Amino acid sequence: MSAIAADASARSDELFGHPKGLYVCFFTEMWERFSFYGMKALLLLYLTKYHLFSDDNGYNLIGAYGGLVYAMPVIGGLVADRWLGMRKAVVFGGVLLVLGHLGMAIEGHPASSVGGVVTRDARALQVFYFSLALIIMGVGFLKPNISTIVGKLYVENDPRRDSGFSLFYAGINIGATISGVLCGWLGETYGWGWGFGAAGIGMLAGLANFVMGQKHLRGHAEPPDAARLRERVFGPVTREYAIYLAA
């Protein structure tokens, strides 16, 4: 009877033949990619037109940003594997991404060029660099772990796993396709803040979706040792919050 009850419980947590957790990850990643590619579509134009970077300096910054974005998931995955767990890592990454994208929407004064001398708003640039750093860290924590959660939703050798990942990657493509058009159009038509703000709102929608739907992850994304996370490492600060602060 217990096996039958367990099977019935598992089936009640499915939708269209897949775990409901897949759709939670689908929409979370769709909105994360919406925000990521929406911001990326504007970045070079923002640097060269608003802050008057040269093309070379703009490409150099984007190259450094791209390199760090693809390097940080190694660290984010390791931290989640050893301490945080995938669920907490995705939430933390989502919060960083929301803050980073909304920070990008804060406009200062556009740069000016007089006699070949470029004057830039130093405070606006500081906010920009800090926001970019938040996005890099956010991607590092969210991207590798949400993909791993999808795999954990299926038992070993489950024939549905391949189609589940196909659906998941379809969400990535949908988010990337829509954002490049929408955020680019908003940025060019109404101002940079509108384009970056739309990317931030998209990520906020993804984070809200994940937080509300995390009950469908079937406990597969929890910390490996919850008690260790609650240990105090200095003063009242627990290991979990020490990780957040260190990031």
Label the model's feature ranges.
Residues 20, 24, 57-58, 92, ...:
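Cytoplasmic loop-to-transmembrane helix junctions
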Residues 63-82, 98, 143, 177-179, ...:
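Central cavity-lining transmembrane alpha-helices of secondary-active solute carriers
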Residues 41-61:
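Short amphipathic helix-loop junctions that connect adjacent transmembrane helices
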Residues 40-41, 74-78, 106, 174-189:
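A gly/Pro-rich, aromatic-decorated transmembrane alpha-helix motif that marks the paired
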Residues 1-20, 156, 184-247:
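Intracellular loop-helix junctions on the cytosolic face of multi-pass helical membrane proteins
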Residues 1-33, 37, 112-126:
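Cytosolic juxtamembrane N-terminal segment immediately preceding the first transmembrane helix
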Residues 92-123:
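C-terminal ends and interior cores of transmembrane alpha-helices
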Residues 82-98, 158:
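Cytoplasmic membrane-interface "Motif A"-like loop-to-helix N-cap segments
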